[in-house]
């Protein structure tokens, strides 16, 4: 492994003046080993939206995606942040309708579209943003799809799917723990911007988890079919 003692420094300059300076810790990894580290590879971090591609795995692996004919485009919406352009909000609304729910079921809350053009168009039309416009509405619809699929489980009642001990969130937590090899059982989660519980991970563990995600043979058996 190539270890660099210093974090990468990124400077924003205005002319010759350094306006701001940012230290970047970085890891390059395969599924089972570190290749290069800049700064502190064990630095604890909250991946937030960067871990959506792992948070979506239970919906696929537990059969919810197949049961509700979730398309590849919808999986992409669940595994990423969208701009709330028309194609995105229309797709999320149609997905919700297919699982028998409406926008009111989304507990992410409303927010302005990330896209400046979409945001300006929304306000020009005199329409307030809804939860569909939240960049995480696809992820939340994925959570709701899992809850609907496993509706016989009393821990998956709706509403309330944001609770850390709700059946959706315990399954998502377990997926993150398995993919990163990090024990989350004693970690107290904090709340992300869209309301879900989030956890801290060593940077190196996140790098290896992402490497595993694109190498299905390295994915834990529970999620190989979903990777």
Segment roles from a protein language model:
Residues 15-16, 131-135, 195-198:
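A generic local secondary-structure boundary/capping motif
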Residues 197-216, 222, 226-227:
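Active-site-proximal alpha-helical segments within enzyme catalytic domains
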Residues 1-42:
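Beta-lactamase-like hydrolase cores
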Residues 41, 190-194:
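Active-site-adjacent structural elements in folded domains
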Residues 44-53, 196-200:
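Short, conserved micro-motifs enriched in small and acidic residues
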Residues 64-72:
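Phosphate-handling active-site elements
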Residues 1-3, 71-186, 212:
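Active-site-adjacent helix/loop patches that line small-molecule binding or acyl-intermediate pockets
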Residues 47-65:
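Active-site SXXK
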């Amino acid at each position: 492994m190539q270890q660099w003692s210093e974090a990468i420094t990124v400077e924003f300059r205005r002319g010759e003046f350094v306006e701001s300076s940012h230290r970047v810790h970085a890891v390059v990894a395969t599924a089972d080993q570190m290749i290069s580290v800049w700064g502190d590879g064990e630095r604890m971090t909250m991946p937030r939206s960067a871990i959506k591609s792992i948070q979506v795995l239970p919906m696929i692996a537990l059969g919810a995606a197949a049961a509700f004919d979730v398309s590849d485009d919808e999986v992409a919406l669940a595994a990423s942040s969208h701009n709330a352009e028309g194609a995105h909000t229309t797709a999320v609304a149609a997905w919700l309708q297919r699982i028998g729910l409406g926008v009111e079921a989304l507990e992410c809350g409303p927010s302005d579209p990330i896209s400046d053009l979409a945001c300006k168009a929304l306000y020009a039309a005199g329409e307030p943003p809804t939860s569909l416009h939240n960049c995480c509405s696809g992820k939340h619809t994925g959570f709701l799809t899992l809850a609907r699929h496993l509706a016989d489980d009393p821990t998956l009642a709706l509403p309330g799917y944001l609770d850390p001990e709700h059946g959706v969130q315990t399954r998502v937590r377990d997926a993150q723990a398995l993919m990163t090899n990090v024990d989350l059982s004693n970690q107290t989660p904090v709340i992300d911007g869209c309301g879900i519980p989030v956890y801290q991970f060593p940077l190196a563990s996140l790098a290896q988890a992402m490497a595993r995600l694109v190498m299905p043979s390295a994915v834990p058996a529970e999620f190989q079919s979903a990777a």
